[in-house]
Amino acid sequence: IWKGLVGSEMCIRDSHEGGHALVSFNMPSYDPIHKATIIPRGRALGMVMNLPERDKHGHSIKYLKARLAVCFGGRVAEEVIFGKDNISTGAGGGSGSDINQATQLARAMVTKYGMSEEMGPVEYGENQEEVFLGRSVTQTQSVSEEVAQKIDKEIRKLVDEGYNQAKKILTEKIDDLHKIAKALITYETLTGEEIENIINKNLYPKD
């Protein structure tokens, strides 16, 4: 279905945003999709926007784990469709990237929100600059290297869980991923309702 399009920036972008959208759609504990678009805006080549159904003043562990999976939806979609060797830099790291957001979120869950059974309900540090939390903790607090390594391990565990959840969804629902990606090529922007209709009813927007 994608023969001849591998390496096309547009095709990768459609698949990437389609991956975010499909993982999000399959996470009942996460916010509903408002829209998905491949129209560039600022530094973003495309985006999937989610809006909560009501005002929230906090988030559950289940919600944040769903967010981790959604963060990896784009990268995993590229991997599933094009193969690991064709994953783009758009799915990589850097400030504001999917990997950066996932790492920062997992870090906060472990060190700020007390959501790690291993580390317990303790706040371990404020420094958000280092990718490897153990190092930043060592810089801001006199914790042992053993504790720093445990923190890194817990962060990695959460990140891996999100990545694997995204991969499970996109592998099992690969046909839906193709549908959304192809629709994004055609229409460029899809609402949450249109995405639901494409997945559940094979019904596409009218031109």
For each of these PLM feature ranges, what is it?
Residues 13, 21-207:
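Soluble catalytic regions of large protease machineries
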Residues 1-7, 12:
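Single conserved hydrophobic/aromatic residue that forms the stacking wall/gate
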